[in-house]
Amino acid sequence: MEQFHATTIVCVRRGNHVALGGDGQVTLGNIVIKGTARKIRRLYHDKVLAGFAGATADAFTLQERFEAKLEKHQGHLMRAAVELTRDWRTDRVLRRLEAMLIVADTEHTLVLTGNGDVLEPEHGLAAIGSGGAYAQSAALALLRNTELPPEAIVKQSLEIAGDLCIYTNQNHVIETLGA
């Protein structure tokens, strides 16, 4: 069976102001299955943002588990992330899931992987998915050379990624925290 390909997710932070955005395209082989998928969510009483890339069903499973860990740890982002990735790495079923998550609150941005990685990226930005490298490059240039707010940087980065990556479209969802 062919793999679902999707997406571009990018997160930009300036201090405690953070924006997380993603495109809406889901592709199966060379066919666009959906152009309006929502891959960005607000979690834990709207205090945490989460975005996912990878196999859609796998990503939803991981996001649900992350949300349960957030509830268990009263919204403590780092503890929830470490516990999720520990489970993800050691559980035989979870280990097969093919997805990545970016999660953020007003203090931290984290990238979570199935290898058990909990990465806090440098430069106040992170990007994942098929268009992630394009979006990250664009965001880094804008972060270094402009005073644009995070949501404007995320928007422009997603536009650039959508122009370059066939698995990324121009239908964006952007959520913010702080200000």
UniProtKB/Swiss-Prot annotation:
CDD domains, per the entry: protease_HslV
GO MF terms, alphabetically ordered: metal ion binding; threonine-type endopeptidase activity
Reactions accelerated catalytically: ATP-dependent cleavage of peptide bonds with broad specificity
Name of the gene this protein is made from: hslV
Chief location bin: cytoplasm
Oligomeric and partner information: A double ring-shaped homohexamer of HslV is capped on each side by a ring-shaped HslU homohexamer. The assembly of the HslU/HslV complex is dependent on binding of ATP.
Keyword vocabulary terms for this entry: Allosteric enzyme, Cytoplasm, Hydrolase, Metal-binding, Protease, Sodium, Threonine protease
Lineage of the organism: Bacteria, Pseudomonadati, Pseudomonadota, Betaproteobacteria, Burkholderiales
Name of this protein: ATP-dependent protease subunit HslV
Matching InterPro entries: ATP-dep_Prtase_HsIV_su (IPR022281), Ntn_hydrolases_N (IPR029055), Proteasome_sua/b (IPR001353), Proteasome_suB-type (IPR023333)
Entries under PANTHER family matching the protein: ATP-DEPENDENT PROTEASE SUBUNIT HSLV, METALLOPROTEASE TLDD
Active site feature: 7
Domain of life: Bacteria
GO terms (BP aspect): proteolysis involved in protein catabolic process
Role, per record: Protease subunit of a proteasome-like degradation complex believed to be a general protein degrading machinery.
Enzyme class, first EC level, given as a word: hydrolase
